[in-house]
Amino acid sequence: MTGLTQALAAFVSKPSFGDNEQAALAVAKTGFMDTIATMMAGHNEPVVNIVRQFFANTTTPAEAPVPFLGTMHPSAQAAFITAVAGHALDYDDVALSGHPSTALVPAILAEGYVLNSSGLEALRAYVVGYEVWAELVSRETDQYHLKGWHPTGVFGAVGAAAAVAYLRRLNEADTRQALAISASLASGLVANFGTMTKPFHAGRAAAHGIEAVRLSMLGMTSAADVFEHPAGYLNALSKAGRVDRTRPADTLGKTLRILETGLSIKRYPVCYSAHRTIDGVLKIADTENLQAAEIKNVHITTGVAQASMLRNHHPVTGLEAKFSAEFAVASAIVAREVGLAQLTDSFATRSDVSGLYSKVSIETVDTVCPLDPAFALTDRVTIETNDGRKFDSGAIRFPLGNALNPIDAAGLKRKFLDCLETGKVANSSIKGADVGLYDRIATLETLPSLRQLFK
């Protein structure tokens, strides 16, 4: 039987998507659209400036652009900076217990620029990276977040390496080396959620994917069984050792997980664990016209892993607020919105907002969503007012924007343009000067070269 590491390498070096390729590429294109949008929106965040300053004296060779800076950088460095920007606002898409696009897209954009890859090849590389990530994460029955792992950093490095190895057309042997090297570069801790280090995880993952491939091309060796070995990647990451290291990976390329799991597009720039709660609170608050002064208590029922990510119960900064169920509830009630405008230090500490934090209680349940084990099967919100009225959201499983409750193309375009406006990035399609960035991404499969994307 072919081992997992070898099976992954075989798929990456010679992928086959069958009759479902076009549908898979459409999902990948959504990943590019959403990531480039959030990258543009987040490029002015302090963490991006810190990373840019860190690299200020090491900008050669000039291989790939950082579009929002208008500067050229070494490929891995460009991927690092753009991935940090894409994840800085925590507004980027979600799947596979993490944020696949914010690791995959920056790595593909950077190396694709170096290689003069076409838009079609970029989309195929995304699918390759996604499928490798999906194969690995599907083998664990427990929740990575409860072990302290941030899957975006842990799986992102391997997924990015797979995508870049495909772009580079590495043979099977070199691909295996690259994937195994990337396995030793996997990192990212939940304890750093709500700080600048969380988007740093995405930056490192994208850069590590490129570095692993280039090290392999230079002849660096690595274990031929790194993923399935008892002292290897999957066992080391596993919370209780119940990970399946021996299952054949014979469905790779035959059953495309990108079509089963898809991508969930965030409507709110906060941890996805809070999105069900926000939908529930907004539904009740809007229907009943509830005001903050009327609230006696708000009770949330959610998953154990979700609650572990929402670790800030009394946030005092906009960053901390992104990982706070209490803030999500308060913002939804006070502002009837949980958006970028609310994610500020001043709003998080406003008396009418912070006054609600102590009125929020959280109950965890052990149910698991079979589509994403980081989530409970459903969440629920109940609100009680000072005059004794009680309101119940009912079971909430798929928030709007989820892959199984998707926003439409018009909604995705609105988010894209809003992100560009937030980042103060001019979009030529608005001015009518040319087809514009949005339209170039929307027709990415027809673009002869990625170098034409950010013209």
Question: What is the predicted function of each stretch?
Answer:
Residues 1-98, 190, 194-207, 214-455:
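Terminal-appendage/accessory-domain detector
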Residues 25, 29, 33, 104, ...:
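Hydrophobic face of alpha-helices
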Residues 77-95, 103-118, 125, 132:
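Function-dense linear segments that define catalytic or interfacial modules
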Residues 94-101, 149-154:
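Short helix-coil transition sites and intra-membrane helix breaks within transmembrane domains
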Residues 101-109, 156-163, 207-211, 274-276, ...:
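Well-ordered alpha-helical segments within folded domains of soluble proteins
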Residues 113-211, 223-230:
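Glycine-rich, mobile lid/loop segments that gate access to catalytic sites or pores
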